[in-house]
Regions:
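Bacterial Sec-type N-terminal signal peptides, specifically the leucine/valine-rich hydrophobic h-region
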Residues: 14-17
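Cell-wall glycan-active module
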Residues: 3-4, 20-445
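Bacterial N-terminal signal peptides that target proteins for export
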Residues: 1-9
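Secretory-pathway extracellular proteins and peptide precursors enriched for disulfide-bonded cysteines
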Residues: 11-12, 412
Length: 445
């Protein structure tokens, strides 16, 4: 009974739960009513205003082409190169000696011996027996040594000591060590210090260094293994030049010493001096320029004229020192590696010269030889000068200051050349047989 009442009481609750858990029906819900169609009133389209036609642009004229500047007119073809100088004919030593005895100063010591050695040298080198040739060599001998085979040098002992002190300080050698080394007895029986105190000539200094290099280690260190005396004798030629000449040409005296020994002898000094001064062809019209070359290097006067012409043609500043290339340790350096002033100026003129850079480089390497004058670069350069109305000289004194421990005042290559020229004219005046030579020119110097 109680159970029946409980069920009856729960009946309404169960009915409510059943309503909440009704399973989904398979019947679809009724479709929604269609939305009412709203008819809009017709719209009125306002036409856009028609734009006014744009004005027709004026035609742009085509740019007027700027004509390229015309290339410089080509220089005319070069004429054939002049032939090389002919080989000199044989020379009679007797004829040279006769000329020398006419023109050498009358008061020099051993005058006959000087004439004999000049004759032997000229014959060996095929230098003609001409007054102006003999007088040219005589002028250099007089200028460099006043006719002394081993001329004294003023204050040589003082100069040599100062140079040794500089080297000692450079190597950090104590003065006491240096003094001890110089106190040793040298091969001639005197101490090195005694010989140093009494130095008078470059030959004595050269022999002192030779003994120091051989006998004491300190001497070899100070000299760097080489004798620092590089020039000497009556014509002040370099030992290196003498060495080269004795290697390349037969030396006319036998037996012969070493090149260094021969430089300090009368015969060797004038032989090497004659070689340096006269044994190469030139186109100069005055001996003055050979004297300048003797001091500055072969063909320096010709090359200085080229440098001055390049300055005129290009406006570039070029020092007329006679070197068209740069040099290191006496050897030319390629202008492509270290451009010289002349190289830069020539490159600026390439178009007008009609010569390419490779040709210019080849030609500049001939600057210490006569063949440079027959090169395309040289000949085109003077052809261009003629075209511009210039009349440049083919030779000029180089502008070089002279530097040496032996020189105590400002001297130049021009000074040296003019001093030699003065002595040369005095020598020519002593010849009463040959016709006088005008001061403005020389017969094929």
């Amino acid at each position: 009974m109680t159970r029946t009442l409980r069920l009856a009481a729960l009946a309404p609750v169960m009915a409510g739960l059943a309503a909440c858990t009704t399973l989904p029906s398979d019947r679809l819900p009724p479709a929604p009513a269609p939305a009412p169609v709203i008819t809009l009133p017709p719209t009125t389209t306002v036409p856009s205003p028609v734009p006014a036609p744009l004005p027709t642009p004026a035609p742009v004229p085509a740019p007027v082409p700027v004509p390229a500047p015309p290339p410089p007119p080509a220089l005319p073809p070069l004429p054939p190169a002049p032939p090389p100088p002919p080989a000199p004919p044989p020379v009679s030593a007797a004829e040279v000696r006769a000329v020398a005895l006419r023109v050498l100063p009358p008061n020099i010591s051993e005058r006959s011996g000087w004439a004999d050695d000049i004759a032997t040298a000229f014959a060996a080198l095929s230098i003609p027996a001409q007054t102006h040739k003999v007088c040219a060599l005589a002028a250099v001998i007089e200028q460099e040594s006043t006719w002394q085979a081993d001329p004294p040098v003023a204050n040589l002992s003082k100069i040599a000591k100062a140079e040794l002190d500089k080297k000692r300080e450079r190597f950090g050698i104590p003065k006491a060590v240096m003094d001890l080394a110089l106190s040793k007895t040298s091969p001639d029986g005197r101490s090195y210090q005694q010989r140093l105190d009494r130095l008078r000539t470059e030959r004595e200094l050269s022999m002192l260094y030779e003994d120091m290099i051989r006998e004491i280690p300190l001497g070899a260190q100070l000299a760097g293994g080489q004798n620092p005396v590089r020039t000497g004798g009556s014509t002040q030629v370099s030992v290196a030049f003498a060495t080269e000449q004795m290697r390349d040409k037969p030396y006319p005296w036998r037996p012969a010493g070493t090149p260094r020994e021969e430089v300090f002898k009368r015969r060797g000094g004038l032989y090497f001096g004659a070689t340096m001064l006269l044994d190469y062809p030139v186109s100069y019209n005055r001996m003055l320029y050979r004297f300048a070359d003797y001091n500055a290097g072969r063909y320096s006067s010709r090359n200085a004229a080229v440098q001055s012409l390049l300055t005129q043609l290009t406006g570039q500043k070029i020092d007329p020192d006679g070197d068209l290339l740069r040099y290191k340790a006496g050897e030319p350096v390629s202008p492509r590696t270290e451009p010289s002033q002349a190289w830069r100026a020539l490159l600026a003129l390439q178009a007008e010269l009609g010569v390419n850079a490779a040709q210019i480089e080849r030609d500049l390497k001939l600057e210490k030889r006569f063949e440079f004058e027959t090169s395309p670069t040289y000949r085109r350069l003077y052809q261009l000068a003629d075209k511009r109305g210039l009349k440049p000289p083919r030779e000029q004194l180089p502008d070089i200051d002279l530097n040496s421990p032996k020189i105590s005042r400002k001297l130049t290559t021009a000074w040296f050349a003019e001093r030699c020229e003065m002595r040369y004219r005095v020598c020519l005046a002593r010849d009463t047989v040959s016709p006088p030579v005008p001061a403005a020119s020389d017969p094929r110097p």
